[in-house]
Amino acid sequence: MMNGIKSSPCNMPYLPDDLLLNILGRVSRLYYPILSLVSKRFRSLVGSLELYKIRTLLGRRTENCLYLSLRFSYGSNPRWFTLCRRPTRTPSPEPNLKSRWFTSCFRPILTNLTRATSKEEKKLSENLMVSIPTSNDCPLSGLTCNTIGSYIYMIGGYINGVLSSRVFFLDCRSHTWHEAPSMQVARKSPLVNVLDGKIYVVEGWRGSDYSNLIEIFDPKTQKWEHVPSPSAEMRGRYISKGLVYEEKLYLFGDKNVVYKPKESRWDALGFDMNLWLVSYGSSCVIDNVCYMVFYKRLIWYDSEVRYWRVLKGLEKLPKLRHRRSCIRMVDYGGKIAILWEKKVRVVGSDKKMIWCTEIALERRSAHKIYGKIEWCDVVLTVPKSCSLLEFIAVTI
């Protein structure tokens, strides 16, 4: 009430779904998590497959989206998050974190901690990891994922405490779980790689049945096929890492082998190639170059001389964790995306921060590659007990 005049809410004109979908189709998908908070109607439209048909008709290119899965307590199912961009609002010296734009999972760090920590933690992040609502749950308590197109496949794990061969995938357009054909063999925690549009599943644990070491799934035919295992002389007691590089599948362990799909052939590898170093850190391959985090530095593999070189130009990058369980890196549309954990530097705090950075790449000569930090933000704050599971890029 002002000067005796009763105020009334602003009457927004009702826009038909077709028009709203046309508008939403022109907006970057990075803003969809925020837009889904406007109303139930917006949430339904943002998660509809019709929206992506319209984006295609409008000539919108596919976008690369980052997804993160976390386990908040022992035995609980993973929770999924996706990267979104904070919308630009009216400038304010003290942004209101209680605004309806935000939920608790949007906040990169709690307000009372922000004032007590260092400058790097005081700035509100422009990029945030937000929890995604799924229309159904995945019954598989799995640990291993990989992506093809807009689908995240969860492979290997347990259902109600029983080891299962069932496979599920998340459609990242509608955030709905679906079931794919089951594997031929139940697997606990396999290595999963994508090569030539097919999913290669490798059991890496000691004592595995080597006759069923590997099988591949073709999403086009929806069929699983058996792949002959390497000979007893080639294979070792365990496999700790799989890597797709130069259109081949490399498997590293106490012995190293490479599978050449075009020839259906296995070859033994010596340690002189030096590519086996990827077993000791998080890695990704971009434009046929392998990158990895090794002892808090980013390095890349120079295949001409079989030598690892330091990625230059990243002097301002915060110190990275070396432990594989605390850091992940992926190919993010031709750039490197790195995600890592960092303690909140407040006495008695039971929180930790999750940082993320995007790094553009520039090859300046045959033996020199430079990186440029596009952005580096705290994207989420979680309890210390929370475990980092998967960090993957999806093309939508």
From Swiss-Prot:
Keywords: Kelch repeat, Repeat. Residues 9-55 form the F-box domain. Gene3D superfamilies: Kelch-type beta propeller. Kelch repeats lie at residues 151-197, 198-248, 250-296. SMART domains: FBOX (SM00256), Kelch (SM00612). It comes from the Eukaryota. Pfam families: F-box, Kelch_FKB95. PROSITE patterns: FBOX. This is Putative F-box/kelch-repeat protein At4g11770.
